[in-house]
């Protein structure tokens, strides 16, 4: 599974790298985190977490600095979090998390993306109950047992630790993600491939042929919206 998460990040970074969308989305997220607390990552855990994720996605330093500088100013721009759940082809399920300054615009755009690309937006809660929220940490290593023991000693609520092809994947309770990252740093881990809060499907579906093509277009349409921050789904090997 570790390679799966690393591949997802690499795939998304490569796809988004052709545009500035990924930079803009992280810019908003960094701005909000800095505005809601101290604009100093050493004094603001949420801000430090977002900056670390931005660096994993290869967001340039000047983009990060610009967002923090904006938060230090007198701007009153307000962003609101949202979630939109829905369905794609052949049993596929999708959760879309947004961060927007215009909820009506975002809701209309997400609904249109679903409707025009073979999907159907559902009611709140129609999909999310079939997903589990977890912290996911991925880094280089091969001794899962040792990592598990280190996290337990640090009183981190760990769901699972997996080792695969030189990569360790740690699943934590969502509230213990930051604690898990710090515990691993304290034990010598210097670089992380993934540090994310994820919605993990309880079961996955396999799509092929036209269904897979339709699903890919739907995901691309959702992710291309400037207000969409994260898209989760239950399709295997995608």
From Swiss-Prot:
NCBIfam families reported in the protein's UniProt record: PRK00110.1 (NF001030), PRK12378.1 (NF009044), YebC/PmpR family DNA-binding transcriptional regulator (TIGR01033)
UniProt GO MF annotations: DNA binding
Keywords: Cytoplasm, DNA-binding, Transcription, Transcription regulation
Main location: cytoplasm
SUPFAM superfamilies cross-referenced by the UniProt entry: YebC-like
Listed name of the protein: Probable transcriptional regulatory protein SPy_0316/M5005_Spy0269
Keyword Cell inner membrane in record: no
Family: Belongs to the TACO1 family. YeeN subfamily.
GO terms, biological process: regulation of DNA-templated transcription
Entry's localization field: Cytoplasm
The organism's taxonomic lineage, starting at the top: Bacteria, Bacillati, Bacillota, Bacilli, Lactobacillales
Protein species of origin: Streptococcus pyogenes serotype M1
GO annotation, cellular component aspect: cytosol
């Amino acid at each position: 599974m570790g390679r799966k998460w690393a591949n997802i990040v690499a795939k998304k970074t490569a796809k988004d790298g052709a545009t500035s969308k990924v930079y803009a989305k992280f810019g908003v997220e960094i701005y909000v985190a800095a505005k809601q607390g101290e604009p100093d990552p050493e004094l603001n855990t949420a801000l430090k977490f977002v900056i670390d994720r931005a660096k994993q996605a290869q967001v340039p330093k000047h983009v990060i600095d610009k967002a923090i500088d904006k938060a230090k100013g007198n701007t009153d721009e307000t962003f609101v979090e949202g979630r939109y759940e829905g369905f794609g082809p052949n049993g596929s399920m999708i959760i879309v998390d947004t961060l927007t300054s215009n909820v009506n615009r975002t809701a209309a755009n997400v609904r249109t993306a679903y409707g025009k690309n073979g999907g159907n937006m559902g009611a709140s809660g129609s999909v999310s109950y079939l997903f589990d929220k977890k912290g996911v940490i991925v880094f280089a290593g091969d001794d899962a047992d040792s990592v598990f023991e280190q996290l337990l000693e640090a009183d981190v609520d760990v769901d699972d630790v997996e080792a695969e092809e030189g990569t360790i994947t740690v699943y934590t309770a969502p509230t213990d993600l930051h604690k898990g990252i710090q515990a691993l740093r304290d034990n010598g881990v210097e670089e992380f491939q993934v540090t994310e809060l994820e919605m993990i499907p309880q079961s996955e579906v396999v799509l092929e042929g036209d269904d897979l093509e339709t699903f890919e277009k739907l995901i691309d349409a959702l992710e291309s919206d400037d207000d969409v921050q994260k898209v989760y789904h239950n399709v295997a090997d995608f």
